[in-house]
């Protein structure tokens, strides 16, 4: 009798496990409330990112918390992986999105309208250097001050990296293929002989691209650059405390605004190296009736 009960229990557990493994979220259904289909979850990235803070504000300002919407912390890689899997089966998903980023080139995505302007207007990505860099390393200062490119330029490098190319190799390829643009950063800059320079960055795809490219440009005038990835707050602190020489990863005025304010007076802002960046919530274009953050609310 005991043996029969154990066998029955094992079979029941096996059936349950197989059923669970075979369960996947259904394709998007425009006739049903979105929240119910994705457990009222927005798929996000690193907890300290400015877009995550803005999204927490969006949940409150649009009263999404009334429906118990939540923001799931992960990483950029995990978020894009989840997005890719969802879109393969045309499942519903809401993610924190920003441009420039390769996901907007590779996938058919759209930003949700933000009528309350919680995410702010278009952002620019600034170059920030430590105080005294102009005097200590004038050639590096000049290259960093000259560094400017477009969202399309950045996307080229990001797509290469996403396809498996090493970031340094992708940067070298872009430098080789764009001599006229690079010349605008390096022409007239006095060369050095192996002087060291340290750049820090947050490990977002966009900043991996820009930091590796500017490091290659610095090599062209004789520098030996070191680049180090870290979280966003330590990145700002590294420049403000002279632990690093600079970074090209300051999304302003929104994403990095809090850190700009916290460390103001302890760094030099060289201005934008890329204009027209944007952050917000994004969904696949096949979610045709979800066009605004307000559309996330449960229908009454």
UniProtKB/Swiss-Prot annotation:
S-diacylglycerol cysteine: lipidated positions: 21
Alphabetical list of InterPro entries matching this protein: ABC_Gly_betaine_transp_sub-bd
Location within or outside the cell: Cell membrane
CDD domains, sorted: PBP2_OpuAC_like
Signal peptide positions on this chain: 1-20
PROSITE patterns the UniProt entry points to: PROKAR_LIPOPROTEIN
Function noted in UniProt: Part of the ABC transporter complex GbuABC involved in glycine betaine uptake. Involved, with BetL and OpuC, in osmoprotection and cryoprotection of Listeria. Can also uptake carnitine when carnitine is abundant in the growth medium.
Name of protein: Glycine betaine/carnitine transport binding protein GbuC
């Amino acid at each position: 009798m005991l043996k029969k009960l154990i066998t029955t229990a094992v079979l029941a557990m096996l059936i349950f496990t197989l059923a669970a493994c075979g369960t996947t979220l259904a394709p998007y259904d425009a006739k049903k409330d979105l929240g119910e289909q994705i457990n009222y979850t927005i798929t996000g990235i690193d907890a300290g990112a400015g877009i995550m803070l803005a999204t927490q504000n969006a949940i409150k300002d649009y009263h999404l918390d009334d429906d118990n919407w939540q923001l799931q912390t992960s990483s950029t890689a995990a978020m894009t992986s989840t997005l890719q899997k969802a879109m393969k089966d045309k499942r519903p998903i809401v993610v924190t999105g920003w441009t420039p980023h390769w996901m907007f080139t590779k996938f058919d995505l759209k930003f949700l309208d933000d009528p309350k302007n919680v995410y702010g207007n278009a952002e620019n990505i600034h170059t920030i250097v430590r105080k005294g860099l102009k005097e200590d390393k004038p050639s590096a200062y000049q290259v960093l001050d000259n560094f400017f490119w477009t969202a399309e330029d950045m996307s080229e490098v990001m797509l290469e990296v996403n396809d498996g190319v090493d970031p340094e190799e992708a940067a070298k390829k872009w430098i080789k293929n764009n001599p006229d643009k690079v010349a605008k950063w390096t022409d007239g800059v006095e060369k050095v002989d192996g002087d060291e320079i340290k750049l820090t960055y947050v490990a977002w795809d966009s900043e991996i691209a820009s930091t590796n490219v500017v490091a290659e440009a610095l090599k062209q005038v004789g520098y030996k650059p070191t680049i180090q990835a870290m979280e966003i707050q330590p990145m700002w602190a590294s420049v403000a405390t002279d632990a690093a020489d600079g970074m090209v990863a300051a999304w302003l005025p929104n994403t990095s605004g809090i850190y700009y304010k916290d460390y103001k007076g302890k760094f030099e802002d060289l201005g934008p190296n890329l204009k027209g960046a944007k952050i917000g919530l994004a969904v696949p274009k096949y979610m045709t009736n979800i066009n605004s953050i307000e559309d996330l609310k449960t229908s009454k």
